[in-house]
């Protein structure tokens, strides 16, 4: 009986999560799906600031739509890539080359494909993930609109957040010690990328509560 109730609660949470998608987001995606022919793929990017709700939105969309969801966090730099020269690049704090080679270049493969997400525990590439062909593909995370990928997206979103709300969310999610790394490392690198390429200018700007 307890397991049955837990299953019901989980189903309710999933339904609530799916219905939490902002109308401006679902409307833009629905329009892109209608505009493109049934045989063509639709690619959606969710870029934006740390703590902006990109992952939460991506997961909600994956519950609502028949799609693939990819996380840019699965493409952290490997140890040998973490050099001063790499970090000096605007947008260099992600393995954008591998993401393009392993994911973007294969989205149209009829038989699907595999890629290896980065494992933050072992700091190595993890076991291969098998991905089926889907018409709709959603890529969430900072650097998802990196110009290295070209003009590939039908819709781009940019998640915005005030510095005060960003601080509160990161502290609640990651704690004080991890927050220091965000402030000293990750947020400055993201801001450098945003400013260098003016990422928000090609995006629908959204605030996710």
Language model feature labels by segment:
Residues 1-23:
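Charged, amphipathic alpha-helical linker segments immediately N-terminal to NTP-binding catalytic cores
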Residues 49:
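P-loop (Walker A) phosphate-binding loop of NTP-binding proteins
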Residues 54:
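Conserved lysine of the Walker
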Residues 57:
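Hydrophobic positions on the alpha1 helix immediately C-terminal to the Walker A/P-loop
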Residues 65-80:
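Short beta-strand-centered segment that lines the nucleotide-binding/catalytic pocket of NTP-utilizing
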Residues 81-126, 136:
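Conserved nucleotide-sensing/catalytic segment adjacent to the nucleotide-binding pocket
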Residues 124-173:
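ATP-dependent NMP and nucleoside kinases share a basic, alpha-helical "lid"
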Residues 146, 175-209:
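Small-molecule kinase domains that catalyze NTP-dependent phosphoryl transfer to phosphate-bearing small molecules
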């Amino acid at each position: 009986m307890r397991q049955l109730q837990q299953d019901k609660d989980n189903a309710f949470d999933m339904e609530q999560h799916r219905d939490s998608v902002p109308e401006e987001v679902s409307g833009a995606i629905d329009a892109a799906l209608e505009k493109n022919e049934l045989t063509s793929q639709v690619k959606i990017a969710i870029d934006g600031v740390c703590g902006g709700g990109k992952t939460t939105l991506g997961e909600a969309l994956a519950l609502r739509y028949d799609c693939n969801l990819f996380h840019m966090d699965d493409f952290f730099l490997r140890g040998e890539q973490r050099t001063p020269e790499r970090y000096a690049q605007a947008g260099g704090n992600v393995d954008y080359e591998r993401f393009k080679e392993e994911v973007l270049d294969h989205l149209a493969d009829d038989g699907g494909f595999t890629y290896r997400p980065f494992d933050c525990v072992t700091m190595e590439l993890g076991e291969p993930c098998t991905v089926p062909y889907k018409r709709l593909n959603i890529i969430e995370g900072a650097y998802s609109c990196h110009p290295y990928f070209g003009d590939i997206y039908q819709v781009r979103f940019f998640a915005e957040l005030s510095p005060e709300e960003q601080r509160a969310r990161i502290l609640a999610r990651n704690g004080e010690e991890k927050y220091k790394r965000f402030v000293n490392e990750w947020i400055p690198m993201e801001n450098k990328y945003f400013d260098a390429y003016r990422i928000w200018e090609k995006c629908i700007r959204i605030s996710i509560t």
